[in-house]
Regions:
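Short, glycine-/small- and polar/acidic-enriched structural segments
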Residues: 2-129, 133-134, 160-166, 181, ...
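Short, solvent-exposed loop/beta-turn-alpha elements that line the ligand-binding surface or hinge
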Residues: 29, 96, 186-187, 255-264
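Helix N-cap/coil-helix junction residues
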Residues: 32, 72, 136, 240-241, ...
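Short, hydrophobic alpha-helical packing/hinge segments within bilobed ligand-binding/sensory domains
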Residues: 44-46, 64, 149-153, 169, ...
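Pocket-lining segment of extracytoplasmic ligand-binding domains
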Residues: 149-236
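Secondary-structure end/capping motifs
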Residues: 205-282
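Conserved C-terminal helix/tail region of periplasmic/extracytoplasmic solute-binding proteins
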Residues: 275-313
């Protein structure tokens, strides 16, 4: 059997399948061993891949596009989740629904600062494009090295609101220091919140990647069909949150699947144009430079499940 160990970089994002694969037998059942390394952000994973430290990463697609533009030979070989960015604000801040339009919602932040994870992360790009689209040059953006810092920054008034993962909204709800101001489906339709990305030299290990993708697909389906059991495993694996917190995070944006359908790819290519306009990349990176579809089409040949939701929602 082909080389059995994969060096994997992942984030603290608990709805990624990384924690589920770490805490279950899904990889071992497929004769795969993995070394896991936690990173603060997608751009940090890209830097580690560039340094030769990783074979595979769990990453939002904008950092991948930026890495390819800089000469890194990467390929997105599977999806995982879409629409994983929310905006959270202080409890007294009017929400998008209360404001009635995105323009009115953003207007209230004139002269204030909004927070996001590091520059080049998917949350950073979505927020900056939103401000550009609505001509809000009077709103500043502050990037934080870890997404985990955003909740405290809202509490202290350092920032007025933040763009981040659904866990940010779950934290705000649990501790009462903020609330969900813009839900994930109102920001960027079908945005590729994360995919499975490898160095292209890994594509030669077809058997190993096929077994990994089989495990990843099984984990995505597990989240969809038994989120409570998955939440128990993830909570135990992280050792930092309880199952109820994980379950709430799952439900804020319940759009899980391993497939790479046309909608996922089209949304990614929209990011290419946005990244170019924002000056993050020097050229229009091509679709075939970003994606390698052969493996996941073999593992998941049918229709995608991103819009099918999860049990209990």
């Amino acid at each position: 059997m082909e080389g059995d160990t994969i060096r994997i970089g992942h984030l603290s994002t608990m709805y990624h399948t990384a924690f589920l694969l770490r805490g279950s037998a899904l990889l071992a059942e497929r004769n795969i061993s993995a070394t896991w390394a936690l990173y603060p952000s997608g751009p940090d994973i890209i830097a580690a891949m560039q340094a030769g430290k990783l074979d595979l990463g769990y990453i939002g697609l904008p950092p991948v596009i930026i890495g390819i533009d800089r000469g890194l030979d990467l390929a997105c070989i599977a999806g995982g989740h879409v629409e994983g960015t929310v905006i959270v604000a202080g409890s007294d801040t009017p929400t998008l629904a209360e404001c009635g339009s995105m323009g009115e919602f953003l207007k209230q932040f004139a002269g204030k600062t909004l927070g996001t994870p590091p520059k080049g992360s998917i949350h950073d790009v979505i927020l900056r494009e939103l401000l550009r689209e609505h001509k809000r040059a009077d709103v500043a953006v502050k990037n934080y090295p870890w997404a985990d810092f955003l909740s405290d920054a809202i509490s202290t008034g350092e920032i007025a609101a933040a763009a981040g993962t659904p866990a940010l909204a779950a934290t705000a709800h649990r501790y009462g220091n903020g609330r969900l101001a813009v839900p994930p489906d109102r920001l960027w339709p079908f945005n590729p919140s994360y995919g499975i990305v490898v160095m292209r030299e890994m594509l030669e290990k077809k058997g190993l990647l096929a077994r990994f993708l089989s495990a990843h697909e099984a984990a995505c389906e597990w989240i969809r069909h038994d989120p409570a059991a998955c939440a128990d495993i993830v909570a135990r694996t992280t050792g930092m949150v309880d199952p109820a917190f994980v379950l709430e995070t799952y439900r804020i944006s319940p759009k899980y699947c391993a497939a790479l359908p046309p909608e996922y790819i089209a949304s990614t290519m929209k990011f290419v144009r946005t990244l170019h306009v924002l000056g993050y990349i020097s050229r229009q990176v091509r679709e075939d430079e970003i994606f390698d579809l052969a493996g996941i089409r073999s593992i998941h040949p049918g229709p995608h499940h991103y819009m099918a939701g999860i049990c209990g929602t």
